[in-house]
Amino acid sequence: MSEPRWTRRKAQRPTELLAAALELFVERGYAATRLDDVAKRAGVSKGTVYLYFAGKEELFKAVVREGVVPVLKRGEKMVSGHTGTTAALIGDLMRGWWAAIGSTPYAGLIKLMVSECRNFPELGRFYSDEVITRGYQLVRKALQRGIDRGELRAIDPEYVSRLVFAPLVLAVIWRYSFDYCGVSQLDPSRYIEQHLEVLLSGLLAPSVAPSRARVRTAGTRA
């Protein structure tokens, strides 16, 4: 016997509230988003929001934990279980991040934090702990793997981990700023592939550099 419709609807409400909150946070920013508006966007009363979340800050944290953190978990598993070259791993991480975050509404949270973390330092620290620090850690692990295997030069993973994704973060910021002014954006796929070419030219050990074409995985144009 199937569940009553109202029961199924109730089970979906947290997801619907998170989706509405994400839309509004990206559209209006954190400061300008009100719980009344989130409730209206989700088609529920404001009181319903409080049944699931203590307030706007908890709602924001839930958006991050439900939508962004799982992507990091998948990235960590990818790094731990990868059996191919480190060049291919770095490429897979970049393409995977863009597909799961950079090309989705969750990318708007990056622009939001850049704009508003100064006024909301607690949220900034939360985002740094839950997302930024964890992201850099998995990239550092990938880089250290390459160094240990003799595939990468003896670079400093602490600093290079930040350089790896900096161009992608810039692409996201551009998307949520200049794109709205009619300034054209470069094709993301080509942008990522060109970044990989330049990055790996500097990272790969001399003995590996001639084979850097192996960075291209199945389905990627040569």
In which residue ranges do the predicted regions lie?
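Hydrophobic/aromatic-rich alpha-helical bundle segments in the mid-to-C-terminal region
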Residues: 125, 147-196, 207-215, 222
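C-terminal alpha-helix
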Residues: 142, 198-206
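Short helix-capping/turn signature of helix-turn-helix
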Residues: 53, 114-120, 130-131
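Amphipathic alpha-helical packing segments from all-alpha helical-bundle domains
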Residues: 88, 99-103, 108, 122-148, ...
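Short, basic, alpha-helical segments at the C-terminal edge of helix-turn-helix-like DNA-binding modules
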Residues: 65-71
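Hydrophobic alpha-helical connector segments
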Residues: 62, 76-110, 158-164, 192
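Basic, helix-initiating cap at the start of DNA-binding domains
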Residues: 1-44, 51-58, 84
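Amphipathic, non-transmembrane alpha-helical scaffold segments
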Residues: 10, 18, 64, 90, ...
